Amino acid sequence: MKKIIILLIVGLIFISGCARTVTQRPKGYLGISISFYRQLILSIDGSYYAFIIAFNENNVITEDPNTWQYYIEYDGFNQKFMWGINDFSSYGTLLSGKFSEDGTNFSFKISLNLFSNATSLYMKIFYFVYDPFVYDPLQGFRDLYWQYPDSESIRIDLSTYPYSYNSVLTGNIISGLSLWIE
């Protein structure tokens, strides 16, 4: 009788532990820190930088904005951090990021609640220098020719806690990327 009770207790603990690790999703924030080789100047002499981090819960991200479910933009022209969704119907100042004093590091946090019940998230960084004296006026993101080289989509596992990712990137603008869940 004792063996049966012990077996049932061990089985119950095992099953509840498995269910918890499969279904539990961390609540909190996704932290992102990006390091640059040189000081990032977001506007100079009439030109400005568009710095975009795109997200998708299901698929790999490409340069096509239709593959972005959400994005964060730092618009050097307006000097604002903006949050948007892929159909551009919702676009506004939702978050604030922080630049280091020397302008070589940018960090911010995003609430995981924004990504509904997703267990993974794809992220890709885009970077563009826009000179209004050289290019015609923009008609939206579709007209930008992204200049960030060697960028692959990064898969973030939201079901793993704690999660962290550190990478040294090979592009000529961004030197390092750190991600974490807290």
Where in the sequence are the language-model features?
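Sec-dependent bacterial lipoprotein signal peptides
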Residues: M1-C18
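Surface-exposed extracytoplasmic segments
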Residues: C18-E182
